Swiss-Prot record:
The gene is fhs. It comes from Leuconostoc citreum (strain KM20). PROSITE patterns: FTHFS_2. Transmembrane segments: none annotated. This is Formate--tetrahydrofolate ligase. CDD domains: FTHFS. SUPFAM superfamilies: P-loop containing nucleoside triphosphate hydrolases (SSF52540). Its EC number is 6.3.4.3. Pfam families: FTHFS.
Amino acid sequence: MQTDIAIAQSAEILPITQIAEKAGLKPNEILPYGYDKAKIKLDPTISRKKDLGKLILVTSINPTPAGEGKSTVTVGLADALALAGKKTMIALREPSLGPVMGMKGGATGGGMSQVIPMADINLHFTGDFHALTAAHDTLAAVVDNSLQQGNPLNIDPRRIIWKRVLDINDRALRHITIGMGGPTSGVPREDGFDITVASELMAILTLSTDLMDLKARVARIVVGYTYDKVPVTVADLGVSGALAVLLKDAIMPNLVQTLAHTPAIIHGGPFANIAQGTNSILATKTALQLADYTVTEGGFGADLGGEKFLDVKVPILGKTPDTIVVVATVRALKHHGGVALADLNNENLTALAAGLENLGQHLKAMGRYGVPVVVAINRFSADTDSEIQAIKDYAQAFGAAAYTTTVWAEGGAGAQDLAAAVIEAADQEADYTPLYQPENEAIDKLNAIVTTIYGGLGVELSATAQKQLMAFKAQGWDKLPIIMAKTQYSFSDDPKRLGAPKDFVIHVREFVPKLGAGFLVAMTGSILTMPGLPKHPAALDIDIDETGKITGLF
């Protein structure tokens, strides 16, 4: 069986100018990055249609080590829609090097349902993440320089909340001391690193509507507090323009293609467990303006990327999904039902029935938004007909039809039934209802997410979090949308509680205000913003030969 990268390397790749033409972009509306990649210029005249196209949101059950193949289904579904004669585009996030070299892998799909050039996209791509890292760390350097140069803003070094970032999983950098080496080496203080995708700049990049909106959002970033506990912003430091300059190319969406030559826009990459987990507003909006159907996805499960797409991205995008597709696999559901990874290839209808409760909670959560929901069963070779039918019957009880897909092996041809169902569902009248209103109190928003989306009892705030909320109310920040930073493996904040637990509360240990992005991050459980490498990182399996051919990259 060929690896994903072997399939990608043997594929015919069309010139990016040809893909742009297929998408409806004129030659002067793109900036080619070589033969097979391009930036799409920020041009308000790109819109070719009076009405935006249909928006299909792909999400999934809680991920497991068994794999769900959400990105693979996303790509395969788009190719299937194209096969059905629909003008289709994909809008995905960019992969982070941390997981690529760590344990999760890339974000370009798999098998015959991939976006290409796969290796380039999973590695440095067009340099967006490097530009973002440089901008973020420039701001960090400016903060420390202000301390060194007499501290004119009266910044309290103990209350600086702007860490440094790196797009690599490196647990040793979570907590560090900087400014050592004497008076000429800066002011000593505690600091740390987050992974680049956790940067507020990444959230801003993906939520900005244009370059000036990005610059205005950057100016609102809070980097820390004075000795009098007054917020210090980028506007106070005077570098919003410089940071916007560093991001002027990164804000432009990236155009590539699938193996079947469906145009794909890949842009932005916030994780859904520590940020909003969606691709950029600009990428999605551009695709909607050009195509009849745009297929996009939310990171991790519907409890994270799905909820954040619907409650954080949709109000800015100004377009609700026309259909939500929830991806599930027999293997993952059996794992949620208690089956060990080594035994997932064996039929086990009892465990599957127990694990189906995880799917059920996601269907209830997505169904409450008033958008038609369809289930995609990503079929593996060991799945039995009885197991597949059990999922279909279960989903039907929630009013959601389920369809098997074999897109890894067959590409778009393996999702034709799913595509037909999505087309039919997208023609239904959606009645989108947000989970909460902007004027709701933060605690009410938190409880709505936990009780309605997660199926839990509510939230419990630490003393620190309670104190922060009181301070935020005084600042007028308490009505901002909520981003839950939570484990992706469970509805609860305990990654070991699989399935669909009910008797749990979510423990919020602290909040992180992200005024530039426009939300409050609720840090729950033991979630981290700088991952570590596993015992056997993926980097150990990646190699390159004398011809430049890469191996081991999935």
